[in-house]
Amino acid sequence: SAAALYGAVAANGAIMVTTKSSQSGKVAINVSSNTTVETPMVLPKFQNSYGVSNQGTFSWGDKLASASPNYAKDYYNLGYTTNNSISLAGGNDNISSYFSYANVSSNGIVPENTYMSHNLLAKVGFNLWTKLHVDVSARYNNQHIENQPTAGYVGNPTLGAYLFPRGEDWDYYKSNYEVYDGTRNINVHNWTNTAQEQFSNPYWMLNRQKPVSYRNRYE
């Protein structure tokens, strides 16, 4: 799978760009664009019989009067990825060239997860002598990623969505993910049992602990 080859950033798929060699002849222009839509394939099933425990951290407390909604389903968004590209190729018997630009824009299924990349490629080939041909190429890649999906227990906002105590008010904590701490004069994350610090409000992590990465690569 793409994730196995390229890691968590490719959890929703990877776009493979195969470059062409510079060509001689008439100028050829190619333009392409496509969009894919992503949704979770499988979600965990939750028990709906017992609510929050007496410590306010986990489920399996008192029996619930009615079933709770699937908070994990409410947590995910409808994701999409759009790929655009344009290329020009042409030349003559002595010199040929190929230029391309492509971008990928993605909003992941995890809230606040975005990915944007720009790719530029230029290749020129020319004959110096009858038996000597030279190819010169240059490539530039720019990436901007916010809230790249993570795995594991620490720093994973999805954990809070999966372990949120059954029967609690998910919408309240979604809208009020932080509260003011007068003893420290700062806003802190608001959760069912903040004192236990078992895991954090996912919306606090997504909005206040947002990892952002940039990359510029030249070849």
What is each of the regions a protein language model found here?
Residues G13-A14, S21-E112, K131, Q148-G152, ...:
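Residues embedded in well-ordered regular secondary structure
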Residues S105, V124-F126, N142:
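Beta-strand elements of well-folded, non-transmembrane domains
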Residues A14-M16, N83-S85, N119-A122, R139, ...:
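Membrane-embedded beta-strand positions in outer-membrane beta-barrel channels/transporters
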Residues N113-G125:
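Short secondary-structure subsegments characteristic of cysteine-rich extracellular domains
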Residues S1, G7-V9, G13:
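Short acidic/polar hinge/loop motifs at secondary-structure boundaries
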